[in-house]
């Protein structure tokens, strides 16, 4: 989106996810458009290099355990003195304060402690964790918004940067709805309900088709529920007291699912989707990646794009979102596999270090 991003390269990040011929695929997409440098912050010369880098930077993001930067003499006060306009995002599992601040924090712990896992899964099954790093992703999104707010405040009001304390735990908890208020006012505790949301309406579930595919259907709004019953050839159900309004459908949710699921199970996915589309019902296929890549809507919007990678050749990955009308984002490069790929550019060209100095720092293990 126009900003220059530099990431401190680490070997451990390259061991995550799938690989092809030893090349980490997760790394390729997660760190696209970022310049990768190596930097040993436990070394005094590494600390001095960081101070030079942040002298004219807008934002610095770190995710060390609280107190680590201070141990290296790189705490907020020091960084702010060097660059009063700098915004520093401090990401940690549990935040910079509180009794858990020194605990190691991972997304899995946040997904558990936020209440997300407790409300996810089947009623008779275990708490269910997401199939990808949801908590980490949410923390990244919240961090991005926070940075934009801080930069706006700096540029239009105070002229000063600030420190942003972001835990991985709290963003995900924030997205889990009205649970705190419902417990405070009603003593209600939300439990696992599978794909149903009985507090909102019915039908809302996933249903298997005759040919083994799955469809997701949501008819929480009264008008949508009426359309579903008409679409499946049961218009009389709209006058049945058991299904006439949302509250009644929730009370008879098992019967609703049996009726809707029975009809869907007797039809192929193509037949069911066509029928529901005709009646403007809210229904969609449950896709794996093959469905996404072959879907004409994803193709028309170029949701998945192809990037030229120097090692793998043309590779597919998610495109930039959202779509800006005047200044669209672009994927300029995939993440380089070689550690410290941009060391010479950043340290040599930007900071003015000589090739001899770079070689010396590399020999010492500073970069």
PLM-predicted stretches and their roles:
Residues 203-279, 283:
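Aromatic-enriched alpha-helical interface/lid elements that frame and gate functional surfaces
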């Amino acid at each position: 989106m126009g900003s220059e991003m530099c990431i401190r390269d680490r070997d451990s990040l390259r061991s995550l996810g799938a690989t092809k011929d030893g090349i980490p695929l997760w790394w390729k997409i997660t760190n696209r458009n970022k310049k990768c440098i190596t930097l040993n912050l436990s070394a005094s010369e590494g600390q001095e290099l960081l101070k030079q880098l942040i002298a004219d930077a807008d934002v610095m993001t770190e995710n060390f355990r609280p107190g680590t930067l201070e141990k290296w003499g790189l705490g907020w006060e020091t960084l702010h003195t060097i660059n009063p306009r700098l915004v520093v995002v401090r990401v940690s599992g549990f935040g910079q304060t509180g009794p858990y601040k020194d605990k190691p924090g991972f997304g899995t712990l946040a997904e558990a402690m936020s209440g997300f896992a407790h409300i996810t899964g089947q009623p008779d099954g275990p708490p269910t964790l997401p199939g990808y790093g949801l908590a980490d992703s949410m923390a990244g999104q919240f961090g991005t918004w926070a940075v934009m707010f801080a930069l706006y405040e700096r540029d239009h009001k105070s002229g000063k940067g600030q420190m942003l304390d972001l835990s991985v735990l709290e963003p995900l908890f924030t997205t889990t709805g009205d649970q705190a208020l419902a417990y405070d006012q009603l003593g209600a505790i939300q439990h696992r309900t599978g794909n149903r949301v009985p507090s909102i309406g019915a039908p809302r579930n996933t249903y298997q088709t005759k040919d083994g595919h799955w469809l997701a259907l949501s008819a929480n709004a009264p008008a949508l529920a009426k359309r579903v019953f008409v679409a499946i050839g049961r218009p009389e159900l709209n006058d049945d007291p058991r299904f006439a309004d949302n509250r009644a459908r929730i009370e008879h949710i098992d019967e609703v699912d049996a009726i809707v699921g029975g009809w869907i199970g007797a039809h192929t996915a193509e037949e069911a989707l066509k029928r529901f589309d005709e009646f403007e019902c809210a229904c969609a296929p449950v896709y794996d990646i093959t469905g996404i890549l072959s879907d004409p809507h994803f193709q028309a919007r170029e949701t998945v794009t192809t990037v030229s990678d120097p090692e793998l050749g043309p590779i597919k990955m998610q495109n930039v979102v959202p779509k800006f009308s005047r200044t669209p984002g672009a994927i300029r490069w995939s993440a380089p596999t070689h550690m410290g790929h941009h060391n010479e550019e950043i340290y040599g060209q930007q900071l003015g270090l000589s090739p001899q100095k770079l070689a010396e720092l590399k020999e010492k293990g500073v970069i």
